[in-house]
């Protein structure tokens, strides 16, 4: 990574902006460097935001961002390996809670995270889906490749497939071999069926009670009735249905604890029989058996190449970097702090946060870092340390944004004008569409 790549990235994202492009770019630089900001208007205190605090809100209200072009810039400037190598993609969603925003449109009930044990709660808000480039080693940070809000009329799996189709096509064109890593709710038949059209391998975590089926047996001569559509049952939590695995690997993890990996091939889900997958069981003898550190984990592998059993366990843990990225975006880059009134403004703010996140990752090799007295010096800087050192680099780079042009004072509202109260919008509850069985009627 060099200064030219960072300059190319900055000019590339500036070219993706339409209206209010200068204010949007100033917002990215302010977000990347103003470590003292704890609220959205405080970003205007940054010397790299050359406008007043009201321009922050006006940029998100009037701004335009070309999402397709922004995705291309992200892929073009991402720290990708050489052609022919594997590249790991993480797909996941994160929630922006808006419980009191009655005037905000298209809010859905989303589950709340980090609750006490056995506690379940839902809160109105918006769901945003991310596709990120996962680092090959822990602690290096993720690189955002695409963001999209999940509307009330769509499912997160459908949005994720649409994102992955666009991102994977760009990566394959560069000669790379993507591997998609996802959590349990993506290991469903609709997602796997749609993903069969994507030129990528897939490693998804599976719930322990998930049921698969083996291929249907060959029809015997003279057999009566319809042929079986599914073979024997395979339930992850029932060892009696497993049988002998097709492949077994045994080794140790980074801490020296014993790890066993078993693989059963040629399985499928009942509602997606044409999608053949391999079911993988990982037994980590060094785990404590808790929900956060399970002893036994289940995964699904889909791809043209056989599952690399020796790499499955470390590869599956790469997705945790995406959760750390969400935490950084919310706690440091103020992603969930602004109380924006429309979904469109929230989508623009999400794209601005993604630009700032990626800019910090690209700038990390160019900076020595800014350490606090109690911080231990590390070989790899955290993105927070990079953010504190960014002002020096931004002064060296300059900005493609034009300086502000004061327009004087606005005339204000006309005398006697009274704005109407904003419309209230209900919270939308997503439910599964199941046909109710009709009641049988008897004729007299």
Feature roles, as predicted:
Residues 1-74:
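Gly/serine-rich nucleotide phosphate-binding loop at the start of the catalytic core
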Residues 43, 85-99, 131, 179-187, ...:
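Short, conserved catalytic/metal-binding motifs centered on acidic residues
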Residues 54-58, 113-177, 276-307:
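Electropositive, glycine- and tryptophan-enriched low-complexity nucleic-acid-binding patches
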Residues 59-139:
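Active-site-proximal, Lys/Arg-enriched surface segment
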Residues 95, 309-340:
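Short amphipathic alpha-helical "interface-anchor" segments enriched in bulky aromatics
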Residues 149-281, 371-381:
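An internal, acidic/charged active-site-proximal segment
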Residues 337-393:
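Basic, amphipathic alpha-helical segments enriched in Lys/Arg and hydrophobic/aromatic residues
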Residues 369, 376-444:
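Long, low-complexity C-terminal extensions of enzymes
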